[in-house]
C-alpha cells in the first residue's frame, strides 16, 4: 500500500494489484450511517444479501473463489438497513486513471469498471461538516434505481473501504463525458481541438441542450426527486453531444422533504442558482429546479456570469428586491427570437414558485420554439 496522505491531499492508497494509470483516492474505513431511510433507494443488484461476500476493497488474502478480500469482514454499522450495508463493488475490475475534478465533499476520477469507462466519486470524511458529507453521499444514491438518457446513471456503490483512506464511500457512475456545460459556455473545454464558443453555443445548440436538461428534469420530477443544484458545472456533455444531469449530492426525495420539514442547512446548492424560496428556508418543490434552469439558460444565451458581489448581498437582493441577471441585452431585445428566449427565462425565475412553468410545460414550449426555427 502507498503511504497514507493528509486529508487535504487527493492522492490515495490503492491495492498493488489494481491496474492503475495514476494514484487516486479510495474511500474510508468502516460503514457510514445513513441519515435517511434509504433501503428503497438501491436496486437489488447493488445491495446483495448479508450472506454475500464483503464488498470491501481487496487487499491481501485470496479466498476459495480466487478473489482477494480483507482478512476479516468489517461489522455492519448499527442502524443501517441490513441490505444497505452490503453495497457491491467488484474492486478487482476497477482501473483508476486520473482525477476529473473535486468539490466540497470529495473528488471524481475517471476509471474503467469491467472494461467500461466510468466516473468514480469518493466522498471525503475530512471536511468541516461531516454530517453534510454523509448527506451528500446518500443523496447521490437517490438516483440509483433510475435510467434515463439525460441522467448520469449510478452503476455501483460501497461504504466499505481500506483502513488508511480518507473517504466515507465510493460511488461508481456512468461516464457522462469529459466536458461540462460550464466549460462549453465559458470556453474552458479540455477537448484537444475545441470548437469556438460561438460555434458550440448557436441558438440551435442552446435549445438542443436546454431540451436535454428539461427532459432530465421532467423524468426526475416524475420520480419525486429534486436535484436542487442544477447549474452548468453539473451538466455533462457526452461524446454523442447529449447533456446529462450529474452531481446529485444536494438532491432530495419529495417525501423526505415533507416528512422531515427540512431546515435550510439540509439543502445545499449554489446561491447564484437557488430559488428565492430556498434562500428563505422554505420547503423545496420541483419549481426550485425550474428556477435554476432559468439561470442556466440565461448563461447559455449570454455566456456571462449571473451575479457579481458578495454572496450574502446577492442572496438578500434576490429575495427582497427580486434581483435577477439582466435581460436588457441585445441578445434578448433585438429580435423576435431573443424576446421569446427572454419570456421563457423570465417565466422560469418568477419570484413565486407557483407562477413558474413545470418541466412538462417548459418542455412543450422549448419544442415549439425549436420547431418554429426550423
Curated annotation (Swiss-Prot):
Q: Which family does the entry's similarity section mention?
A: Belongs to the protein kinase superfamily. Ser/Thr protein kinase family.
Query: Mind listing the UniProt keywords for this protein, alphabetically?
Result: ATP-binding, Kinase, Nucleotide-binding, Oncogene, Serine/threonine-protein kinase, Transferase
Stated name of the protein: Serine/threonine-protein kinase-transforming protein mos
- Residues recorded as binding ATP, renumbered to this chain, are 100-108, 121
Q: Name the Pfam families on file.
A: Pkinase (PF00069)
Task: State its Enzyme Commission number(s).
Answer: 2.7.11.1
UniProt GO molecular function: ATP binding; protein serine kinase activity; protein serine/threonine kinase activity
Record organism: Moloney murine sarcoma virus (strain HT-1) (MoMSV)
Keyword ATP-binding in the entry? The reply is yes
The catalysed reaction is: L-seryl-[protein] + ATP = O-phospho-L-seryl-[protein] + ADP + H(+); L-threonyl-[protein] + ATP = O-phospho-L-threonyl-[protein] + ADP + H(+)
Domain spans labelled Protein kinase: 94-370
Active site at 229
